[in-house]
Amino acid sequence: DRYWREVFDPVAEECGLEKTAPTDQRYFNDDYIAVFDKTEDAMERLLEEDTPENRVRAYCHYHLGVESVLAQTGYYGLSSAFSESGSDEIALGDWPNSQGLVNGISKIRSDEGRHVGFGMSKVRGYVQNGDVDESVVQDVLQDLMPHIAGTVSDFQENINPVPLVNYARDKLTRRIEIITDEDAEIPEVDELVKLDEESSAAAD
């Protein structure tokens, strides 16, 4: 809230725009709400019945669906729009260069990378030990993917959503491969959160 009050609100006022709250419903479409409703349901199910499969479902919803695929796609889109990095196909028209904003986002990515790595490690352990079938992971993430695509596609102008959807789909596929492939290894945190333009390992 503080960042919103001290950064967004003054700019909105100066530009003659309506000041809104960061939790204003207009910012959350039906697909975004569905992602978090399903995540909440998975957490509630775990509280009711703490089993390996329910743990994996919870990890897949939060650590992989939300904090990994959805968040990473958002960071990629912001970096593409507000800096020289990312994809030239996403931002249409003129966008301000806000490298400071992108640098700040990179700090958030680093923090969330630890969460993603933790979740992937837990899920991979259950799958590779034979406690949970890999189909559970695939089912959860494939169920979330249309909602993730719907979230990152919800732009009325100046954004081409196709590269974002492709990025999210590729990221989800790579996460599943790392978890289900016996010979795969979970990347280090710094590699895990790199965006595509930063390293060839960004698909990890």
Summary of predicted features, one role per range:
Residues 1-204:
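Non-heme di-metal
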